[in-house]
Every structure is written in structure tokens, then in C-alpha cells.
Amino acid sequence: MDKNAIDKSEYPRTAELENRCVNIIANLWHAQPAENYMGTSTVGSSEACMLGGLAMKFAWRERAKKLGLDIHAHKPNLVISSGYQVCWEKFATYFDIELRTVAMDEQHQSLNMEKVMDYVDEYTIGTVGIMGITYTGRYDNIAKLNDLVEAYNKTTPYKVYIHVDAASAGFYAPFMEPDIKWDFQLKNVVSINSSGHKYGLVYPGIGWVLWRDKQFLPDKLIFKVSYLGGELPTMAINFSRSTSQIIGQYYNFVRFGFNGYKEIQKRTHDVAVYLSSEIAKLGHFEIVNDGSELPIVCYKHKINDGVDWTLYDLADRLRMKG
């Protein structure tokens, strides 16, 4: 557990475990070996999202230069719903990207497919679909987004692609909702991230990011280090970190297997649906997400409920109970 994951030449078995995890996840997300998929572990989904975003930025820049676009005329942009996790705001700030957010509202509690392509232009490095909106637990319709992107790409040489932020659903949907197409089954989904320490069932913190093909991970983002006993490639932002999370992820994959993960996620789903039904019976709350998709229960206070307390008061009282 005290071994450094970056020192792969000193601890080759750790590198082997990481590669096995990448292969297992690639299979789970329907990556095709013929497309030369690639992936890496990260400290969490925040790092994984940034790697996915950086790959999109560098790939866009290479495509734009070949097409003769003045890449300095406007700031590159990334299109995402306003329900994004804060790591995307950090990515945009750190790497000088305009974050174009498609507003959510009562009728659109995930990415608004009627408006999303209005935000796309030749300076768009990519679009992000979210499998598990932070505020509602809803899924973006990735299959619909794929169709919209496919239609757009047929009209312009300035192609755009999709990164799926599946921090929550990446290790849930494949087991509980296998009929939903959101992953590498879709042509324009080029990268996916997920958190191993959420529904991957590992202690914090570990994330994963995969690309469907090496062409979507520019060579400039793969660094070769030779001062740890051998020349080895690395693509993660962080460097030194413990191997314990990688070992924990591999152990879970082997220990639970597909059926074990499915059983655990089903129990979580059942608890979420039960909780939402009981909360609804209290009469004070409107259920926004009942846990029937991602097992996240989301509710809000009913308007004109006639009580003199707020959800913040409720949260404070719940903290008193631990």
C-alpha cells in the first residue's frame, strides 16, 4: 500500500493491475480493441475530466491548424449543461477555455437537446454529456446528443466530438441500465471518465478516463519519463500517488465480478426508490429524482407549503443526528 504507482519499472505488477483495470472498464464501456483504446487511472474524476478536456483542446487545435483556422482569433470553447460539476469550471479557468453552458430549467433537468447545438461553432473543442447531473441525478441523453453531433459534422469541416462525464453512472448504468446507449457504442463519444470511489465501490480517491482510440489522445499529452529505471509513458496530471486505490479497484472487479456489482447496485437502487417514496409521503416535498435511474434522491420544498422552515433548516437538523 506504500508503493508509488508512478514507479512502474520498480513495481511492474502495479502497472499490470492498472492495465487490467483499463481493459475491464473498456469492455464494460464497449470499447473495441480494433480502435486501439487507451486509458489511465487518476486521483479522481476531477483529474480525469481535465485530461478528457485537455485531449479535446489539443486535438481541436491540431484539426483547426490543418484547416487554416486562426486559433488565436477567439478563445476555444466547451459546451456543457449548467448542471456541471465544479471541476469543469476549474478546467475552463486553468486552461483558458470559454465554458458555454446550456441552461437547465423545470422542463429541462438535463442537457437541453433543442438548444445545445446553438452553442457550437468552429472554436468548440467538444461537447460534454453528463451521466448523473450533480443537482438532479438525471442523465443527459447521450444518444440524442450523438445524433445531433453526427448531423452537425456532416455540414462542416470543423468536427466536434463528445466527452461523457460518467463520474457517477460509469459504474452503475452498465449493470442496471444496459439498454441505454451512452458509451463507446456511439460513434462520436471519444472519451469517458468515471469515479472508482463512487459506484466503483473503492475507497477515495480514484478515477478513470478512457479514449476510444489513440487518435483522440494527442501525443503531446503522453510524456515519457526515464528517471525511474526505465522509459515509461505517463498521461496523468498527478505524478506520485499510492497504488492502494488501483489495487482496491482490481480487487473489487475480481471479487464481485459483473453479477456481484449488479446485485450491489440493485440494492442501492431499491433503497433509493424506497427513500423517495417515503419522503413523498411526508407531504412537504416535491420529488425531483426518485432514484429510478441513478440512485440519487433529489427533492425540493413544495411552494406555499405553509411551514416556517426551509431545506437549510432541515439540513441543519439532520446534521444534529449525524
Regions from the language model: what does each represent?
Residues 40, 44-220:
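Conserved PLP-enzyme active-site core in the AAT-like
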Residues 35-36, 73, 289-296:
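Short Gly/Ser/Thr- and Asp/Glu-enriched loop/turn motifs at secondary-structure junctions
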Residues 320-322:
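Conserved PLP cofactor-binding pocket of PLP-dependent enzymes
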Residues 2-9, 33-40, 72-75, 99-104, ...:
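Glycine- and acidic
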Residues 133, 175-293, 300-305:
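Active-site C-terminal subdomain of aminotransferase-like
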Residues 2-48, 59-63, 67:
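Conserved N-terminal alpha-helix of the aminotransferase class I/II PLP-enzyme fold
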Residues 305-314:
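Short, conserved charged micro-motifs
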Residues 18-26, 84-89, 112-120, 238-245, ...:
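Structured alpha-helical segments in the cores of large, soluble enzyme domains
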